[in-house]
Amino acid sequence: MSDFIESEAEESEEEFEEKDLKPKKTQRFMEEDEEEEEENTEDQDEHGNLRGLIDDDDVEEEEEEERGEPPAGEDSDSGEEVRHRRRKRSFDDYLDDDDLDLIEENLGVKVKRRKKKYSRVKTMDDEGDDDDEKDLIADEIFTGDGDGEGEVEDGEAVDTLHPRDDEEEEDDEESDIDDFIVDDDGQPITKKKGKKFSGYTDAALQEAQEIFGGDFDFAEFDTEAYDHAEEEEEDQDDESWDRPKKQTKRRVSRRSIFEIYEPSELESSHMTDQDNEIRSTDMPERFQLRAIPVKPAEDDELEEEAEWIYRNAFSTPTISMQESTDYLDRGTTTNFSRKGPSTIAKIKEALNFMRNQHFEVPFIAFYRKEYVEPELNINDLWKVWQWDEKWTQLKTRKQNLTRLFQRMQSYQFEQISADPDKPLADSTRPLDTADMERLKDVQSIDELGDVYNHFLLYYGRDIPKMQNAAKGGKKKLKKIKEVSEEDGEEAEVEEEEEEEEQKGPDLKQASRRDMYSICQSAGLDGLAKKFGLTPEQFGENLRDSYQRHETEQFPAEPLELAKDYVCSQFNTPEAVLEGARYMVAMQIAREPLVRHVLRQTFQERAKINIKPTKKGKKDVDEAHFAYSFKYLKNKPVKELSGDQFLKMCLAEEEGLLAIDICIDLVGVKGYGDQTYFDEIKQFYYRDEFSHQVQEWNKQRTLAIERSLQQFLYPQMAKELKNKLIAEAKDNIVKSCCKKLYNWLKVAPYRPDQQVEEDDDLMDESQGKGIRVLGVAFASGRDTPVFCSLINGEGEVVDFLRLPYFLKRRNAWREDEREKKQQDVENLKKFLLSKKPHVVAVSGENRDAHMVMEDIKRTISELEQNSSLPVVGVELVDNELAVLYMNSKKSEADFRDYPPLLRQAVSVARKIQDPLVEFAQVCSTDDDILCLKLHPLQEHVVKEELLSALYCEFINRVNEVGVDVNRAIAHPYTQSLVQYICGLGPRKGSHLLKILKQNNTRLENRTQLVTMCHMGPKVFINCAGFIKIDTASLGDSTDSYIEVLDGSRVHPETYEWARKMAVDALEYDESAEDANPAGALEEILENPERLKDLDLDAFAEELERQGYGNKGITLYDIRAELSCRYKDLRAPYRPPNTEEVFNMLTKETPETFYIGKLITCVVTNIAHRRPQGESYDQAIRNDETGLWQCPFCQQDNFPELSEVWNHFDSGSCPGQAIGVRTRLDNAVMGFIPTKFLSDKVVKHPEERVKPGMTVHCRIMKIDIEKFNVDLTCRTSDLSDKNNEWKLPKDTYYDFDAETDDVKQEEEQKKKQQRTTYIKRVIAHPSFHNINFKQAEKMMESMDQGDVVIRPSSKGENHLTVTWKVADGIYQHVDVREEGKENAFSLGHTLWINTEEFEDLDEITARYVQPMAAFARDLLGHKYFHECNGGDRKKMEELLVRTKKEKPTFIPYYISACRDLPGKFLLGYQPRGKPRIEYVTITPDGFRYRSQIFPTVNGLFRWFKDHYQDPVPGVTPASSRTRTPASVNATPANINIADLTRAVNSLPRNMTSQMFNAIAAVTGQGQNPNTTPAQWASSQYGYSGGSSAGGGGGSSSAYHVFATPQQPMATPLMTPSYSYTTPGQQQAMTTPQYPSSTPQSSHGHHQHSSSTPSSSSSRVRTPQPKASSHTAVDWGKMAEQWLQEKEAERRKQKTPRMTPRPSPSPMIESTPMSIAGDATPLLDEMDR
């Protein structure tokens, strides 16, 4: 392009030097402009810029001129050339603010302001530090800038559309799209080169008007061109394009095309000069548009690249499990196992065709099959094309980095040469050939990044010095160049130096420094080198997995050595060692070999752990996509599949999940304990046992650990994450392509038999091909149906509007029936007159069934009555049609049509030719992305997805071929032309434009060159895919008609085709009248003659003559001569049942499946009609004497005969069998009666009413009937045993989920406890506050003061809080009875079993006595704080006192904060302290179950009896432990069922006792019983054991399973009576949490507890129990139940807390009564 600009610019300069060419009128306008500009000079600086605005580009150019340097990127251009180009650019016509203001004023709309585009290279500030320098060098390496390979490579990775030379990029930094505007003849219409605008044709004007709808005269541009050019030339020095506003009078009537239209519009319409260059260049358009240009390559490089592509693209497996979605291969295989090493040679051939011969993929796939098949199919060739781009990028970056290495090597050599005797500093690391070799061996971008980061670590600080040194040697180099101008190498060096000089003056050292630089400047390099191994040696040890290099031991201890390095930054030896370890860790982490080994190991071993966030716990339910991996533990990344990881990352982005990728197993003990760190640290060890070696080993270990944990692991995890995301996205792109492939592979609809038409009835405009009637409708029943008839060419011939066609034939209203009939008659007339071959009905919703039935019925009547030929009726998916209906293209094509009629047209065209219709949505608006190709398609890079989808179009369009003449005649097919091999949107439209301008058809392929001026490369690529209908041309042309132009035979093989025809007909080629063309025509009529040819011998002969291997091509030619351009697409077939269901419901198997939770609306109750033989089953109620209908259960019939009349009259609806519902997607649902509820439902109408919305779960889907069976039973909806929910991941962390569920439940209970109902109670001590507020209030109150507040237990409870001591408050539960309403105070108040009249009595009789007793203890001489009654503190105090006075028995009393109302009584008679509790009651002090009214009496008795055994502590106490159930509180026991169970027990208890209970309760220990059955049979069981159900072992009833448990006389340890709620939780039996350890995993069997657990003994019947005949177990159990029932009557508000609480037997003992005054459990838990 630069040559083009140069030539154009030179020409334009010559023209503008002639002043005579400037019209006078233009001069006058210019003078006015100059005068007005002078008036506004006060706001401008000396350069004409608005004050405060800086034009960096001008400033930079001026500086460069002063320095005599060309701008960056123009290596060898002289200053004259730079100025030359700047002059050329001076005629750019930018729209300044005045222009935009004027346009806005005239048009009345806001105009998009121009922004800087394409300015990719930023100038460096002179004060830039070396960080900026590093960034610049990284940019140079990784974007390809400054490549010495030639101008073509420069800037290659930057601009996907316009690969421009660096010199142009740099110079045109402020350029915009306006620079590139051309008309469609390729004539530049900007004033960039100051050229005349004399090249506009009527065609250009027409084209612009067609595109933009504008009406303007190009002729006006000619004179204005001079005017603008001169203005720009004169104003260039005074102002930049960012000019200040001027009140200049502009000529609004004459404006150029780029003044009228937005640059973005011009670009999207391909009207820029880049587009023109693409059109005119003889190279396939897609080659020119590739982000990284296609470059020619030598054979050696092709060999190397082919191996690289084979290794990376075809033989290396993906990290995650990605199935091959290459639908062109048979079967689903992994994407690397099918290609053998022979593929490499085929890849090399393909690369040779692409890079050196510029053949596009379809051409290679169709016309060079011998060189790529069978290893490579067309999709593989596209993959080679994509990987070639990656290879080129990698190669370029390697070359850039190699140059940087070489420059650094030269710099180091110069530094060392300056003083050869000076020893190398510790911080200096020579850049040697090993480093260069390592760079040469780099095989991936990751490895290249490793090498570059390694370089920066060691040489980053030297880069500024190197640059400055390079500038210093510039003059010498120039002199050398002058002496030897012909030496190309020296010239290259000089160019490189110039590049560096352009960066600015001498670079300063960085002011910002990282930790490594600080350590380096402190001189810690020396210490770091004494760790024993270099990073390279450690890397080799790691690679070989053994200690290849022994660790060298420095003969001094680390701390001693570190003292020599102490400095201001590191002022202690420990800090020095820390810094040295940091340096070693960083060096190891940057070592490329270490990173390479670790990268491989990390990817092999990496595991994913996932936990939900707080938001995720709430939001991720079973309907959420992240449900199956909400909790994951140690899932190997290798077992990720498809797009799973992308879903994980999306959930993480939404803040739902936290993902952790690590190399070691998490939370696994006993297996896999050894971490990767433990494995590799031995490679940095010295295996000796001296103290010195051990100290160094410790330092090495810490360095390795830091290197892994701080640097390598996070970086590798990030890298791996990006790769996994890329693989998942690639999977999505492939899935989208596969779906589009399946849509495009369908051939046009063909009727079963060609219908012979009556010429009189048919209009000529109908055309050949099949006629289709498209039918479209909307979802509302009141909307009209639109029909559109298209002819064989896809053009709309006629249409019909049927406003009432959606009404039902048997509608209730007569006028609707009549209107429907009228529409049917109209349709009949239309069908009779137009005779379509097929009717295509839009698959909008379930109404499509009804529409199809009505149309079929109508056609059937016409076939019988009017002899209408057979007309097919097909259902067509309308997704594409709806998209087309709403697109801009449909509005442009059918501006006057209503949207539904446009949809009808698209439906008809889709069945006529899917490929053409899908191409309609491939517009610049990217409408094709609106098709539902994949649920996650919007998370893929749009450009990548578009590119892949367009490849599918390219493949299919070239297989089918494109008739260019048809595209001109029928514009709606023009969208196919852009996909022809070698062409594109620009070249395709240009081809059509030339043909339109010449007003001619393409009569043969030769005209592509002669008339359309196509270059040889593009012609070879596209010729075979452009088909010409030679039969239709016939006698209408004088040109030579080549019959092979209508076939897939490529022009390069026409001679062989003729030869085959001549040989097949056995003509004599040497005869004078031999006519190969005639032979061809004869063969086309009798293709079977070709079967006798020996094509293999022909192929051998061709190869011998040097034409190459053409074996497959010859067979293709024979096939083509047998049937020219035979359609290879799959024949059309009607959609199957599943496709119809998905089409009409708009569901997919992923969105609608068995087990899904849905909502539906009840429509009615379904009844089964009564059968005649069932009439005699009427039932008579003996109490009322009335009869009941056996079906509808109506029970008010006085006589049996009335029941029969009820049957006969039809008033009996029948037996209710279920509920009918309707889902949102119009599918009908049915809920059988037994699935309405877990309880028996006789009358469904009592449960649900029509119109009610119910939550259900899908049990069965009938896709044929559009029906689903549903359940709305609570057990099925909750689905605790995962019978219906989607399966969870194999590595799902059920334990973590169970723990979280438990925590959440406890949290909820705490929250529920803190809530209370505000009460209206008039009492000075009453406050509407919660317990926290109460305790805060009491902080400032005196001991014994009272606060009365609402209780969290409910509206019939109050809580009395009194202050026991500082920081200790007791909460007493008060139960109210006889309440008038929820807010008033009850008439009687109860504390446990004691009744009070009012709150004052409670204060006086209950609280104040206790407060007085508490004061007595608080004032006792042996009272001690002990930190709020801390047992440990008490024990320490006793031990200390005993030591001081060994002959005394010390004792102390202390108020207990954990158990308010209790005091610790500690004493130490001998060696071990003992601690007991004294409880405050209103009656006195309770100690060892006795009440003492005074303190003296208490301690007197204590001193006398302290040696007595504590009553109740007997071995029998263990028998009374709580059964192994979380919920085994008395409130959970169903007394009625339990009594029934007890009554059924045998008198003499035997080992079958449990079975007898199980028979009654239905709760046998059947291991096959599912948790769902347990849940339904355990009344009051809330499933607290686990999320997945805990099996039967947690049933409260299992306590009766063991005969040795004497339930009639339960014993109780005194420790229970003293236990307050806070301790009950701690002292409950240990078997609760462990009773069902596996339950959370859904293993439905009884888990046994630990051997120590009493529950395991409880559940084991022992044979000797049967000998206990003296005990009447039935009576005992009955007696126990009666006691329990009496207790329940006393306490009418049972506590429902599912936490462990004391066993039911405890409260029945007489001893526990006194202990009931203790605070409540839930008050203490808060």
Curated annotation (Swiss-Prot):
Would you say which domain of life the source belongs to?
Eukaryota
Q: What are the Basic residues biased-composition ranges?
A: 110-120
GO CC, one annotated term: transcription elongation factor complex
- Where are stretches of biased composition, namely Basic and acidic residues? 502-512
* Compositionally biased spans, kind Acidic residues: 1-18, 31-45, 55-79, 93-104, 146-157, 166-186, 219-240, 484-501
Region listing for Disordered, in residue ranges: 1-196, 219-248, 482-512, 1611-1726
Task: Indicate where this protein is primarily found.
Answer: nucleus
Instruction: List the molecular function annotations (GO) for this entry.
Output: DNA binding; histone binding; nucleosome binding
Every copy of the S1 motif domain together lies at: 1204-1273
Ranges of Polar residues composition bias in the record: 1611-1627, 1657-1669
Stretches assigned to coiled coil = 806-865
The compartments listed are: Nucleus
Specify residue ranges for compositional bias: Low complexity: 1628-1640, 1647-1656
Q: Which GO terms describe its biological process?
A: embryonic heart tube development; heart development; nucleosome organization; otic vesicle development; somitogenesis; transcription elongation by RNA polymerase II; transcription elongation-coupled chromatin remodeling
Checking InterPro entries in the record gives:
HHH_9, NA-bd_OB-fold, RNaseH-like_sf, RuvA_2-like, S1_domain, SH2, SH2_dom_sf, Spt6_acidic_N_dom
Q: Where is the SH2 domain?
A: 1316-1426
Keywords for the protein's UniProt record, in alphabetical order: Chaperone, Coiled coil, Nucleus, Phosphoprotein, Transcription
- Where Phosphoserine occurs, the residues are 90, 1525
Phosphothreonine modifications at: 1522
Task: Tell me, in a sentence or two, what this protein's role is.
Answer: Histone H3-H4 chaperone that plays a role in maintenance of chromatin structure during RNA polymerase II transcription elongation. Promotes the activation of the myogenic gene program by entailing erasure of the repressive H3K27me3 epigenetic mark through stabilization of the chromatin interaction of the H3K27 demethylase KDM6A. Plays an important role during early patterning and somitogenesis of the embryo.
Instruction: State the family named in the UniProt similarity comment for this chain.
Output: Belongs to the SPT6 family.
The name of this protein is Transcription elongation factor SPT6
Q: Which organism is it from?
A: Danio rerio (Zebrafish)
Q: What taxonomic ancestry is recorded?
A: Eukaryota, Metazoa, Chordata, Craniata, Vertebrata
Gene, per the UniProt record:
supt6h
